[in-house]
């Protein structure tokens, strides 16, 4: 009875124990993963040490290959210590792929081909040759188990680890330097070296003097997602192996100089930058850029004084130019005011309506012409004798007073005889200055008053002298049409009585008249401009002569009391 109860209770107890053990195993696995994720910095040195031990084991297998045929007994190693350290390479991480996909199975390391591993380590020292899962034909015992092969090794693990690291680090550095020497001899100076193969795990940097520490320990610590560089987007990962993107070969010297100072006697110390200058390495991997020398200090006070002096000079030049323009504009305004007084005040004090009536015919006023900005200095060339006479004696000044009136006398010759004008000019010699001025102004007023009716009479004479329209010959029974054409007014009733041919003749005649009138208008406009220029010249001459005459009169009046 008791045996049955014991057996019956033993089954649930075994089940409970199995469940408890499985739960504890699962909890231990979860704790291991959590510790790996929480403390990623501690795994990187172990991983590098495991790789070094793995290479040492391959080298040992290669050395023991000839001895294995005679004595196939492998050296004994503490399986618990070595297997635990080797198995750290395949730690469980959720984001890290399994190294077994690339053939990095530590259990099959013993069965890898020794010749292929040695050849790959010599050809490219920066590569970790993936282990093949196939059995090597050269191995005497086939695939060897790493744990079972190293059971009886009595040397402590830390001592063995240190010895292996010290043994392999100089060899790797020597192989790296030999490889770089070969690249330099081949002229390998490409700006961007090709990416390493998928089997590459570590990106080494060549040490300056060939120190006793491997460059793989200088790698940055891995992050939980398995990438070696946390912020480097150029790190690639193929099948769980890290492939560092290619970098320019010319920048290896400066990078090594930054990571580790080079000794003075290093044989590769010449590859760094020059000793006299500072070489800055750009982040994109370009060529070394020497630092520019500092800019010399500026003397800001002297510069400000120089600028202030330049501004003061510019201001003085502007003030002088403005003063000149103001003086010239004042002189021009004074002369224009005098001309306006002479034209409007003295000529038309009694009858300003005469000039205004003349202006209605389309002729611009004198004041507007004087203010139109015409160059009046050219007008002095028209009558240069007046200037010469004004500088002469009193008798010559009296004769010069008659010179501006010569065009007036020519203009008035149509309605007065020359004898009368000559007698009047002779009688002016005996008159006083004021009386002569008044008489000349009266003559000018009369000439201006006679200008408009004389112009109308001349226009009527020109109209009568024109040829009759050829329409009068085509339309003898309609004489009024030719008159209407001359007056440029036709009635619709007259046009209805005409044929198409007659209308075409009238149209052609009108076109020809328009062309002839346009040509005549152009000629008349040119004549008008010339007359305006001549009139302005006369006014300027009158102004100058009036001033000169007044000065002479004052001079004579001062001499008379002195006598």
UniProtKB/Swiss-Prot annotation:
One Pfam match: IQCJ-SCHIP1
Compositional bias segments (type: Acidic residues): 168-182, 420-430
Residue ranges, annotated region (Required for interaction with ankyrins): 419-563
Keyword match DNA repair: no
Name of the molecule in the record: IQCJ-SCHIP1 readthrough transcript protein
Oligomer and partners: Homooligomer (via coiled coil domain). Interacts (via IQ domain) with calmodulin; the interaction is direct and lost in presence of calcium. Interacts with ANK3 (via ANK repeats); required for localization at axon initial segments (AIS) and nodes of Ranvier. Interacts with SPTBN4. Interacts with KCNQ2 and KCNQ3.
Lineage of producing organism: Eukaryota, Metazoa, Chordata, Craniata, Vertebrata
Gene symbol of the encoding locus: IQCJ-SCHIP1
Positions of the UniProt region annotated as Disordered: 63-150, 164-295, 312-336, 384-430
Highest taxon listed in the record's lineage: Eukaryota
